[in-house]
Design a protein with these regions (language model features):
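Residues that form or flank phosphate/diphosphate-binding pockets in enzymes
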Residues: 23, 186, 248
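Conserved PLP-enzyme active-site core in the AAT-like
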Residues: 1-145, 152
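PLP-dependent enzyme catalytic core of the Aspartate aminotransferase-like
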Residues: 1, 127, 193, 209-263
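Conserved small-domain helix->loop->beta segment predominantly found in fold-type I
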Residues: 105-108, 112-114, 119, 123, ...
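Short glycine-enriched loop/turn motifs at secondary-structure junctions
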Residues: 48, 171-173, 232-235
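Broad gene-expression machinery/nucleic-acid interaction feature
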Residues: 50-52, 176, 236-238
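Short hydrophobic/aromatic beta-strand micro-patches
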Residues: 56, 178-180, 240-242
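Active-site beta-loop-alpha junctions enriched in small/polar residues
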Residues: 19-21, 156, 182, 242-244
């Protein structure tokens, strides 16, 4: 089943953010995507040390058909009337980005940052395998823990996207997920405050295991009703599972639960 809706009905390219999926676990273009974007700061770089992004163009989208993309399809006066769609063909979109957007905004990654991201790709498959393996064990641990109300992970049979997860992610995935601890905000804070291996940080997809309380940080501008619409509650905790030894990760989580119990 392709991801792509009918192009004739929308006239728009299908753009997929594959930051969390990574090219190692899923390649959206093979499923009908026209353009794929990544925040390379996450899994591709792997260590949270630099900022960068990637755009991958399938070259399959017709930028002239709908008449909606004059900046790419029509003659461009700043390039002597050249139409990027005609001159660059399948590379029209990425050529437009390089020739126009980079020219106008000056967004240029430094050589050292580029080096860090390229270096990260050398260990991408190795790291993702470990992220996935650790995540499976953490999900199992949490799903069977008496102090956990709910685990939100597509690998679990009761998750609404479980069938899609099994179809598109046969090698696993989703090392960033949330769970609801039994109790409320106080229990969530106590749990987080007593973790040692997990770092309390807002970023994700790092070799380091990370934890945060979304309701008071990333989504703090929302009221309780708006939070609930996003399935975020005062007892919701977000985890980003790293590549540490699984025994250390599980022991750290259990220490957090023990602190909530007053032990």
């Amino acid at each position: 089943m392709p991801l792509q809706p009918s192009r004739t009905s929308t006239g728009l390219p299908l753009v997929i953010d594959n930051t969390f999926g990574t090219p190692y676990l899923i390649r959206p273009i093979e499923h009908g995507a026209d353009i794929v974007v990544h925040s390379a700061t996450k899994f591709i770089g792997g260590h949270g040390t630099t900022l960068g992004g990637i755009i991958v163009d399938s070259g399959k989208f017709d930028w002239k058909a709908s008449g909606k993309f004059g900046n790419i399809a029509d003659p461009n006066p700043s390039y002597h009337g050249v139409s990027f769609a005609d001159a660059a063909g399948p590379a029209a979109f990425v050529t437009y980005i390089r020739a126009i957007l980079l020219r106008d905004t000056g967004a240029t990654i430094s050589p050292f940052n580029a080096f860090l991201l390229l270096q990260g790709t050398e260990t991408l498959s190795l790291r993702i395998e470990r992220h996935v393996e650790n995540s499976k064990k953490v999900v199992e641990f949490l799903a069977n823990h008496p102090q956990v109300e709910k685990v939100n992970h597509p690998s679990l049979p009761d998750h609404p996207d479980h069938a899609l997860y099994e179809k598109y992610f046969p090698n696993g995935g989703a090392s960033i997920f949330t769970f609801n601890i039994k109790g409320g905000r106080e229990e969530a804070f106590k749990f987080i405050d007593n973790l040692k291996v997990f770092s309390l940080l807002a970023n994700v997809a790092d070799v380091k295991s990370l934890v945060i309380h979304p309701a008071s940080t990333t989504h703090s501008q929302l009221n309780d009703e708006e939070l609930a619409e996003q399935q975020i509650y005062q007892n919701t905790i977000r985890l980003s599972i790293g590549t540490e030894h699984i025994d250390d990760i599980i022991a750290d989580l259990e220490a957090g639960f023990a602190a909530v119990r007053g032990e």
